[in-house]
Amino acid sequence: MSILDEFKSFIAKGNVMDMAVGIIIGAAFTGIVSSLVADLINPIIGLITGGIDFSNLFVNLGDGDYVSLAAARDAGAPVFAYGSFITAVINFLIIAWVVFLLVKIVNRVKDAAIHKSAKEAEAQPAGPTQEQLLAEIRDLLKRSPA
């Protein structure tokens, strides 16, 4: 088997394809969560905290006075941008929460399917045991003329 054939076999496996789909959807989902945090959650938090914009919080580590983080970065000033970190933590927590909920839903669906199949298996009448079948065969053999 050539290396190209092995690679084709590897790619054709369900796990790799599922992972690829997950990565693509995850990348798209990151954009949605970033927008959710930047456009919806941060403004609400800013309203509650008196207009604080977390993404613009920073400490200037160099000389000069800058009105915003963007201005400090444009000037090339060294900054400690802890607001960006807070925003990243909020993004992570939201993504982690959504993934947790999705896993919880998938596990519930799996458990329900397993429970349903177990109930269906219990509902079916049990067939004769191996010993009962062997006893029937023995009895039939005894009754048949030799």
Curated annotation (Swiss-Prot):
GO MF assignments: mechanosensitive monoatomic ion channel activity
GO cellular component labels: plasma membrane
A Pfam family per the record: MscL
Taxonomic classification: Bacteria, Pseudomonadati, Pseudomonadota, Alphaproteobacteria, Rhodobacterales
Keyword annotations of the record: Cell inner membrane, Cell membrane, Ion channel, Ion transport, Membrane, Transmembrane, Transmembrane helix, Transport
Oligomer status and interactors: Homopentamer.
Membrane topology: Multi-pass membrane protein
Family designation: Belongs to the MscL family.
Name this protein carries in UniProt: Large-conductance mechanosensitive channel
Matching InterPro entries: Mechanosensitive_channel_CS (IPR019823), MS_channel (IPR001185), MSC/AndL (IPR037673), MscL_channel (IPR036019)
Location, primary (coarse class): membrane
Name of the encoding gene: mscL
SUPFAM superfamilies on file: Gated mechanosensitive channel
Transmembrane parts of this sequence: 21-41, 44-64, 83-103
Job of this protein: Channel that opens in response to stretch forces in the membrane lipid bilayer. May participate in the regulation of osmotic pressure changes within the cell.
Location in the cell: Cell inner membrane
Keyword Phosphoprotein: no
